Amino acid sequence: MTTIGLLGGSFNPAHEGHLHISLYALKMLGLDAVWWMVSPQNPLKPTRGMATLTERMAGAEKIVNRHPRIHVTDIEKHLGTRYTADTIPALKIRFPRTRFIWLMGTDNLLQIHRWQEWEKIFLSVPVAVLDRPPRGNTVKSCRALERFRSRLLPQDEAARLKHAHAPAWTILHIPLNGQSSTAIRNGATS
C-alpha cells in the first residue's frame, strides 16, 4: 500500500520552508510521496493579497523543481471541498489503496482548534507535525495536545506512523528553516 503525506496550504507563495519539511517527512516517516495540496481559498485567510490559484500552483511547481516524490495538486478544487476535514475522507474514497498522513507545521498545530471540525482530521488519518519557527514552549500547550496526548508517538518511533491507526500522531523536531509566506509577501528575507 502506498503512503502519501498531505501538505495542505495556500502556498502564497510556496517557498523553501515547504520543501524543507516535505523532504524531512519523506525521510523520517518513510513516505512514498508528498502531495502539496494548494488550497483554492483557505477559509481562515483573507482573499485580499491572495495570488490566483494558477499563480500559486506555478510557484509551488517551481519550488518543487520536478522532485520525483513531491507532487503539486489542486485536488481540492476538483473534489469541491473547502475544509481539510472534508477533503481527507474524499481522498480516502477516491484512493482506497492509499494511506494518507496529514503533514503540518507547529505553527498550524497551535491554531488548529480554529479549523472546521479539526478533531475529525486527527480521527481520520495519522498526523505528523514538523517544527516550524517560532519554536519554544508553545507546543507544550495546545488543544490538539490536550485532546490527543495519549496517542502521541515519540519521534524515535515516527516511522511507525504510516502503519498506525488514527488517532495517532507525532511531532518531528527537525532543523528549522525560517522562511515564511507572510515574510516573503511583506518583503522580508530570512
What are these regions (language model features)?
Residues 1-190:
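Nucleotidyltransferase catalytic core that binds NTPs
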